[in-house]
């Protein structure tokens, strides 16, 4: 699992394509990077999106990024058994736009590995906004 902090100026849209919604727009950005590198596109894991969002909200409330641990992660692990995960990963970050966050993830080796790992076939995206910044949790599994 990896974490990332980028707070540079926003580039492009701060909330993503309004037609997709910000969570699905972030997944579209991730899938574009995957497909350009001959990986299969990820499906949106709606059943974990609320958990990912609650983690993003908790990070925004505390003012720093961290990986999910403790009871929520235990709950996530229980869900993983129900969905038959073999492997899971998580990218967390804070920044000015979804595009800049995806660019930062791809520029960081551990985050890029999570995005491009071939075994992953699903991802959940949780987004919170606070103080003109976007806090994000992306959970990958396959």
Task: Show where each model-derived region lies.
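Functional surface patches built around histidine and acidic residues
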Residues: 1-142
């Amino acid at each position: 699992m990896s974490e990332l902090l980028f707070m540079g100026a926003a580039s492009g849209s701060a909330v993503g394509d309004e037609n997709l919604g910000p969570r699905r727009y972030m997944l579209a950005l991730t899938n574009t990077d995957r497909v350009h590198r001959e990986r299969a596109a990820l499906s949106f894991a709606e059943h974990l999106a609320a958990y990912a969002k609650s983690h993003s909200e908790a990070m925004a409330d505390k003012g720093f990024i961290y990986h999910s641990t403790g009871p929520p992660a235990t709950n996530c692990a229980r869900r993983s058994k129900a969905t038959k995960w073999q492997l899971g990963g998580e990218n967390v970050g804070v920044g000015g736009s979804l595009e800049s966050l995806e660019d930062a993830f791809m520029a960081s080796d551990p985050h890029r590995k999570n995005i491009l790992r071939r075994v992953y076939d699903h991802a959940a995206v949780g987004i919170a906004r606070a103080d003109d910044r976007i806090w994000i949790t992306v959970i990958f599994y396959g």
